[in-house]
Design a protein with these regions (language model features):
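Acidic, PIN/NYN-like endoribonuclease modules and their adjacent C-terminal/linker elements
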Residues: 1-5, 108, 114-142
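Short, well-structured N-terminal submotif of metal-dependent ribonuclease cores
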Residues: 1-42, 55-66, 140-142
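Short secondary-structure boundary segments
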Residues: 44-46, 104, 123-124
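A general structural signal for well-ordered alpha-helical segments in protein cores
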Residues: 47, 62-66, 85
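Short acidic, glycine/proline-enriched helix-loop-strand junctions
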Residues: 69-81, 89, 95-97, 126-142
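Active-site neighborhoods of divalent-metal-dependent phosphate/nucleic-acid chemistry enzymes
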Residues: 75-118
């Protein structure tokens, strides 16, 4: 929807670019909403995780997607600075009762800093952290 600010997670990008992914259709259905957002944000950690995960299934698509993100003026890819990593490591260390990965914690830190609430993801970790997941997926997925 116009005016929205959306965080883009690996979960969504993988589902979108891997036709064999069980959430591919859901990701494709969400894509117009992402495209019409006023701002889309992700991180270098998400970009790296995405390319690594898609290297076997859609290397060319992953490369093209990343290049398109960098070329789009509405898209911001936040670098993983030492300060951001320190904040994320603190979240990671303090979340022993969760299964959050470091990339999740980097995402959560960026979302909090930028005042983002919506995430293009089906990852239940985002809901656990208090954000809105734009894709419905059972907690045990991925």
């Amino acid at each position: 929807m116009a005016g929205e600010r959306i965080f883009l997670d690996t979960w969504f990008i993988h589902a979108l670019l891997n036709a064999r992914d069980s959430y591919h259709a859901q990701a494709k259905a969400l894509l117009p909403r992402v495209r019409s957002a006023a701002q889309v944000v992700s991180t270098e950690a998400i970009i790296i995780e995405t390319c690594n995960g898609l290297a076997k299934y859609n290397r060319a698509g992953a490369s093209a997607f990343v290049r398109a993100c960098y070329a789009d003026p509405r898209f911001e890819i936040v670098p993983v600075s030492r300060r951001l990593l320190d904040v994320a490591l603190e979240h990671f260390s303090n979340a022993a009762d969760k299964e959050w990965g470091l990339t999740d914690c980097i995402s959560f830190a960026v979302m909090r800093e930028l005042g983002l609430h919506l995430a293009a993801t089906g990852d239940h970790h985002f809901r656990q952290a208090g954000f809105v997941s734009l894709l419905d997926a059972p907690p045990e997925s991925r």
